[in-house]
């Protein structure tokens, strides 16, 4: 998911002054990526303190939503946190964000093979998951899901095969499915 999230972050066209809201439970390398690009592009990466324990999903949603402002354009959260194994109520967050026009980017690194995953039910704008953790796939096996209406805004991190002519009818897949030889 690190590569997938970096691909997404690099593609964002947030205006200076806008905010990405996250939590203080996120994975370190992705926090660093958000901080790097927010400084480079002039938007703010805000980490909401989420004290634990919380008593319900609604308690979590209400606490997290206190961090949303009129400048919040993106919410970035883990589905299952790396450090504590907490399962965040992502479906509820995504539903509320969608109703308010906020894009959701979900780091599901620890989800595939660990708990049930139904992206259609969760309905995030962007979701990524690691297949090498609980599915025992080769290291680096990851997927990136992007809602169709946002795919045209996601540029490949590495340009290689597929960026010009490929048999897939979906340009997003052409540009991102194969990133060349790793050497």
Each model region followed by its residue ranges:
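Active-site phosphate-binding strand-loop segment of PLP-dependent enzymes
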Residues: 44, 55-109, 113, 134
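Alpha-helical structural signal in soluble globular domains
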Residues: 11, 33-40, 67, 89-100, ...
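A short glycine-threonine-serine/GTX helix/turn-capping micro-motif
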Residues: 169-183
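Active-site PLP attachment segment
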Residues: 122-170
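Short beta-strand elements in bilobed, periplasmic/extracellular small-molecule ligand-binding domains
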Residues: 41-51
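Conserved beta-loop-alpha segment that forms the PLP phosphate-binding cup at the N-terminus of a helix
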Residues: 1-17, 28-31
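Structural detector of well-ordered beta-strand residues that form the stable sheet scaffold
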Residues: 21, 46, 105-107, 128, ...
